[in-house]
């Protein structure tokens, strides 16, 4: 189901009222059913930077800081799985300078995750999902190190879609299934939805309850095509670096009011 939220940054004069409203929402949300899995299309970094007459990577940096905040929000609410769309296979078509800057940022952030106190204190497992072979060697190695160091954790999960495409994920799953059938490890008649799920980039992960897209665009952009068949979709008219906790809480609160039918 699609739900659109229009969000505006409040004037500093209204901050006390917003803080009060945020605390009210937090209490309401904590009293309701908490989603297990939230997925976010982190859109609007470049437009946010352009509005400030800054280069794209300025927006990407502040987008990465916003993601750190969202991880904290999820921990506070007990949302165990967070999946974020960081870089699509189509994003490689951007300018070389922007892609190179992004790759440098990804490498830095993966290396920070390895030593981040919160990752180890909260027990966050990091999964990098996508065609990793398309990534530069240094980024791939940093991503794999973050996965290796956090592999033993299972309190929370941070799935980072990098060099990712929903169609590519399905194609890669089909190839692996066909290979296992040909090798005799899988029978054709045994293939069902749950079997397919085991061949996705992050096997057996519960489907997202909620998909949020920031930036004002109303589309899913090839994100988690297999997994979001029954997810609740929320589109927010605010660039990702400006996404507020109050916006997040309003989405969760709206989700809690829904009767999910799962196609019935």
Curated annotation (Swiss-Prot):
It comes from Pyrococcus furiosus (strain ATCC 43587 / DSM 3638 / JCM 8422 / Vc1). This is Tritrans,polycis-undecaprenyl-diphosphate synthase (geranylgeranyl-diphosphate specific). Transmembrane segments: none annotated. Binds 2 magnesium ions per subunit. GO terms for molecular function: ditrans,polycis-polyprenyl diphosphate synthase [(2E,6E)-farnesyl diphosphate specific] activity; magnesium ion binding. Belongs to the UPP synthase family. Keywords: Magnesium, Metal-binding, Transferase. Mg(2+) binds at residues 43, 232. The active site is at 43, 91 (proton acceptor). The keyword Metal-binding applies. Signal peptide: none annotated. InterPro entries: UPP_synth-like, UPP_synth-like_CS, UPP_synth-like_sf. It catalyses: geranylgeranyl diphosphate + 7 isopentenyl diphosphate = tri-trans,hepta-cis-undecaprenyl diphosphate + 7 diphosphate. The keyword Magnesium applies. Substrate binds at residues 44-48, 60, 88-90, 92, 94, 213, 219-221. NCBIfam families: uppS.
